[in-house]
UniProtKB/Swiss-Prot annotation:
Gene Ontology, cellular component aspect: extracellular region; immunoglobulin complex; plasma membrane
Gene from which the chain derives: IGKV1D-16
UniProt function note: V region of the variable domain of immunoglobulin light chains that participates in the antigen recognition. Immunoglobulins, also known as antibodies, are membrane-bound or secreted glycoproteins produced by B lymphocytes. In the recognition phase of humoral immunity, the membrane-bound immunoglobulins serve as receptors which, upon binding of a specific antigen, trigger the clonal expansion and differentiation of B lymphocytes into immunoglobulins-secreting plasma cells.
Subunit text: Immunoglobulins are composed of two identical heavy chains and two identical light chains; disulfide-linked.
Species assigned in the record: Homo sapiens (Human)
UniProt-recorded name of the protein: Immunoglobulin kappa variable 1D-16
Length: 117
């Protein structure tokens, strides 16, 4: 069974909150991908300048609020399955799903939350 997994850039309203470095541009790739249950899926996020490890990953399903998966680039939120992992620092980051499950059909976002200017 093919699964469609979308990776899209999070809107400016979530990328730029008070005190954030909103001059930092985030680029995700791929913009979309097709994968099957059991596949290893990798989504990358690149910052236009170094953000140390100030990066979070979110999963959003239709008609649902975004769910936090990863914070500080590689720390798994409580209750998130261990098949999700994050890595990277500086400008290049990766979200990996080690074995895609049917419930992982969703849109995935990265968000930078670099320190105050």
């Amino acid at each position: 069974m093919d699964m469609r997994v979308l990776a899209q850039l999070l809107g400016l309203l979530l990328l730029c909150f008070p005190g954030a470095r909103c001059d930092i541009q985030m680029t995700q790739s791929p913009s979309s991908l097709s994968a099957s249950v059991g596949d290893r899926v990798t989504i990358t996020c690149r910052a236009s300048q170094g953000i140390s490890s100030w990066l979070a990953w979110y999963q959003q399903k239709p008609e649902k609020a975004p769910k936090s998966l990863i914070y500080a680039a590689s720390s798994l939120q409580s209750g998130v399955p261990s098949r999700f992992s994050g890595s990277g620092s500086g400008t290049d980051f990766t979200l990996t799903i080690s074995s895609l499950q049917p419930e992982d059909f969703a849109t995935y976002y990265c968000q930078q939350y670099n320190s105050y200017p």
